[in-house]
């Protein structure tokens, strides 16, 4: 499987501009099986989603409007899955930081069917995210073209128990808006999650700046041995890599770390 990790600048609150940027970059890496966009790729991350145009859940379910509709159109056009997170307003008045995993040909008469998503569990209290967003409570794994992907968003990366692999996924996706000031931690944590879980890790981060932070990128694919391949810092980039499941499974058989992990209750007690 070929994956394309899209490192892009995000225009603050300008969905149309961000769609144009993402589309141009994605088309430069045609023939991939999966495209992954950064956290809140359509607006940029804002701790108060009321000041940005959130995707309304009811509309997303019924009509798949822009930008979710655009993700579906690109999935159809490229015959590939497209993943990326955005702020979503639910009917109960709460907001979620929702990572959508959109597969091709999932709409019938304009209605989105069989949608898959993950709501960010660990909200970034340091940045005020807990004041307006509601955390998700479920771990989500999606299978696409024979590869099992665990979904996560940004701050989730710091919590290894939440991302513990029980041999139920092959690759971890982490979409982020991770600031330059903590870039060393980002790179180390991506490698740590790959090594301890014997999996591929797809870490997708943005570049540029917003009213709160500067972002240098660091979009990286880490293989199960902990070897990283990264985009250049501060540059728009599409990192394309192949996930080799045969090699992954052979490694797990020969070096069965997942079979010998402590049970979570034992760790906690």
Where are these regions (language model features)?
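Short beta->alpha transition motifs characteristic of CBS
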Residues: 43, 100-103, 118-124, 220, ...
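Cys-nucleophile CN-hydrolase/nitrilase-fold catalytic domain and related Cys-dependent amidase chemistry
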Residues: 15, 23-111, 179-193
């Amino acid at each position: 499987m070929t994956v394309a990790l899209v490192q892009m600048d995000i225009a603050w609150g300008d969905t149309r501009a961000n769609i144009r940027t993402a589309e141009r970059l994605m088309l430069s890496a045609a023939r991939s099986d999966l495209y992954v966009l950064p956290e809140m790729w359509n607006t940029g991350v804002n701790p108060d989603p009321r000041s940005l145009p959130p995707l309304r859940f009811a509309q997303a379910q019924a009509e798949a409007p822009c930008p979710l509709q655009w993700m579906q159109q690109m999935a159809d056009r490229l015959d590939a899955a497209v993943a990326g997170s955005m702020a979503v307003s639910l009917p109960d008045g709460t907001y979620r930081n929702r990572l959508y995993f959109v597969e091709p040909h999932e709409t019938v008469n304009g209605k989105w069917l069989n949608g898959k998503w993950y709501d960010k569990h660990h909200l970034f209290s340091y940045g005020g995210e807990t004041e307006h967003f509601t955390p998700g409570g479920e771990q989500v794994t999606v299978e696409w073209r024979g590869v099992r992907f665990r979904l996560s968003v940004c701050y989730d990366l710091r919590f290894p128990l939440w991302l513990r692999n029980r041999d139920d996924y092959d690759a971890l996706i982490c979409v982020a808006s991770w600031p330059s000031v903590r870039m060393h931690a980002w790179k180390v944590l991506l490698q740590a999650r790959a090594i301890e879980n014997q999996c591929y890790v797809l870490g997708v981060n943005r570049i540029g700046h917003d009213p709160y932070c500067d972002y240098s990128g660091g979009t990286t694919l880490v293989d199960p041995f902990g070897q990283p391949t990264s985009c250049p810092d501060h540059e728009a980039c599409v990192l394309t890599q192949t996930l080799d499941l045969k090699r992954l499974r052979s490694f797990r058989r020969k070096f069965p770390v997942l079979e010998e992990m402590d049970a979570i209750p034992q760790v906690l007690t």
